[in-house]
Amino acid sequence: MKIGVVYPQTELGGDPEAVRAIGLAVESLGYDHLLAYDHVLGATHDREPKLTGPYTELHPFHDLFVMFAYLAGITQRIEFTTGVLILPQRQTALVAKQAADLDLLSHERLRLGIGLGWNYVEYDALGEDFKTRGARADEQIGLLRRLWAEPVVTFDGKFDHIDRAGILPRPKRSIPIWVGGMSEAAFRRSGRFADGHILMGTVDGAQQAWARIEQYLAEAGRTSVGFGRELPIGGQKTPLEMAETIAQWRDAGGTHASIVTMGKELRTAQAHIDYIAEVRHHLDREVQGRAS
């Protein structure tokens, strides 16, 4: 199983030195990937309709493509995972271009997790329709893959229109697209279009969600073999409890796990690094125990 770390976007005040330190630590400690959450704008919640999501204008978020491009230049091995990029609030052709360049410049280290988001204020500010975001995402996934593969694309969809145009340079592969979310619509979207799914919550809840995704894969005539399953794992866990939960997810069939250090009252980048270092210690001991 691939094990990574979620970058603690909301807790380090947008500190560039924290980005560098944590990115380098994730690689040096032997983790497989760095996952990061996405928001373009934070918004005050006191409005109508009410906003009920977990973030406000007080929570910092680095731009994922910019942050990962920076980290690609100072690391050699770790994968970069958008977990998730709010795709429907963005222009499809621009995402195709940004993702292609990041994948090329990082030597094929991008995994593009996509989702719909919950903040209609972001959509309004970016000029996209919040109400049609699900249908738009379905259309965007196929168009992204065409833009990465074809020199010239003609596309006349409900949301995007391209007349004999393409991006260059194109990536050397079809960048993996994973869907994130715990709604029935997200499970269906994964079954029809995705290379993997980013789940949420507990191991038991993720297993139940996976059963639904398997049904949608079968309905689409697709196999679950090679289909990825990632669970970001948070909560008030000690490093040992975190390692034990990762092992539970592995034993349940998970292919990827990510350590969430946010919400643990870790006040500095070094405190976050110390936590993931201790988790790594317990993970290595568990592997040694299974091998003996």
Predicted regions and their residues:
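Active-site-adjacent structural elements that line small-molecule/cofactor binding pockets in enzymes
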Residues: M1-S292
